[in-house]
């Protein structure tokens, strides 16, 4: 990868490389895309029992409010995906969920929810039964975290 030779790249290249390295090291990792133009990684930390924000460009771990509080971004949609799942994780990254909801106008919320659910179920269907169970349990815990 040219990125490792030059050590120059944008957030997308760094997030792709970091996510791939995490997976190669045996971690569950997924790429996170923010519609206002930034990309980073989430890594599942077994000891924590949850997904952790990891931004290789900023060299930060588990500081999900960095973008709104530190950078002053007005996030709209933040979607995490891997070859096993896809999920709207916006709530993890926003300070005020109600204000965020007012900014989300690109697509109908119900349409987005249904389409993410359908895609997630297709990805889960490609997994072994034991993995499906783990993914479903993690998903339920994550939904509690995001909505609680």
Q: What is the meaning of each model-derived region?
A:
Residues 44-46:
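A generic structural motif
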Residues 3-32, 41:
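Cysteine-centered nucleophilic/redox motifs
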Residues 1-6, 10-13, 33, 48-148:
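Alpha-helical and coiled-coil interaction segments, frequently adjacent to or embedded
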Residues 25-28, 37-39, 50, 75:
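Core residues of folded domains in eukaryotic genome-function proteins
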